[in-house]
Amino acid sequence: MAKNDNAHSLRMVESLKQTVGNDRANEFEEKYPLSKSADIEKKFEWAKAACDYLEENFDAELIYKIRKECRCNDGKSIANKILKYLNKANSIEEFVASFNAKESFAKLEYISDNKILFCYPECYCACVKRVPQQLSRAWCYCTLGNAEGIFAE
């Protein structure tokens, strides 16, 4: 069996275990291994195959749950940065405007007092960011886990 030690693949396998069980996770891991030494083309091919697998085997809600758990970090550093803007602002609207004026890695959109839209302007994922092709939207759902981690702080 090929080596499966890439962090992206390990997170996907763990998420599959938690969401749909060991059998499906093991099936995925055996069929789609990814080594941490994989080059950018191999990583992109793996990400595309992962999206195809998810879309062929699960409904949209389950794909959302699986990918959401594949986030790359806990969001603490971004949460701390956002908190600095929030603590200096007199209102949510001011917080959003100040953040957007000074930061470019993400954008905020004020919806209401209890809702803010958080958006990355591009994909920062090491599996896909340097390949000039696009993936299914399923790949992007990990950002929901990132945003959840950021705002949980």
Task: Name each model-derived stretch.
Residues 1-135:
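N-terminal accessory segment detector
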